[in-house]
Amino acid sequence: IQSTNPTVLQHHLIHNTSPLEMPSVRQLWLIFVIGTLVSSVFMAPILVTSVNAVTLLLFFIVALPAWIIGFSTPVFAWWSTSNEYFGLSTTRKQGEWMLVAGMLSTLPALLINSLISPIIINLLGLSVTDEYSLGFGMILFLSAPIGEEISKALAVLCLARFIDSSKRGFQIGFSVGLGFALLENMTYILNSLLIGEGAAISFVFTAVLRAVGSIPGHATWTAISGYAIGKYVVNRRSNNLTEKSYTDTKSSSDSQWILFDNKSGLPIISSKTRKLPNLPSWLSAGQQKMVRITGNPVIAVAIAIIFHAIWNGSLWSISVLMKDSSIIVQLLTNMTMIFLLILILWIILRRLIPFALLTD
């Protein structure tokens, strides 16, 4: 820099505090619905007609976009739901950390489910190769819930610096669960596309059922753990730090800003403004029907494990009981159980959200 006058150059580094901005919930669900329907239409010729160059070309054209839409858009739709309705100011940096932490938590869970648990079960004399065997079932209703819920809870704990309330812990747990579901969903959607001639049907069923079932399930179970971890972190922080040091820490990590009206000069909104959650009826059953969430992290993680175990164990038990039945009976029974589990999940979620967000 050249100047005729003495010049002092100062470079200020500030944290990026831009808010998390996402497409609306309606837009994301619309993309998901249209994308899955169009993809299934393009894959239908393989199911209806014989495999030939034209049907294979149609399949390969739509396979990659179908996979991306199928595994990602429902996760981001639920993420947008939490960002839009939970009433918590979230920066883009915080949102990215939450999702990435959930994705990283799949690594220890995968290690437990794929390596450690099979070795232990084999040492007990049980087989894990037969899907109807007790050993295989133990992977589903014991190993997976324990390994996955503990891994996700530890991911929430790693984000303790973002936690300023139990409500924030609930939000972080919800987002971490979505990050975990994102990577898990990649595998399930890919498998549904590689099934062969029935890909058009398996893709739609897998994408839709996971969008309204497994994805919010992971988010809900981890949100329970996150709420308790949030309460624990806040209580421990207030007990261990003096009021001054806590204030200094908070002021150094939070940006202070005020937005003024350019005409009147009056303040419109500031960093201290707290938005009240505006919960729609489909997401909240109201404060009259809310269910309390424990503030003990150990109990909360145990509850998450139990819910997860019931989900996996119910589906596995039905498949074992119906293994000698016809394909039609097996399909109807499994679908009935899935719809029942989804209904129970939604009843629980709609009663947990008002407690976590409206009573903190």
Please state what every model-predicted region is.
Residues I1-D360:
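Hydrophobic alpha-helical segments at protein termini of multi-pass membrane proteins
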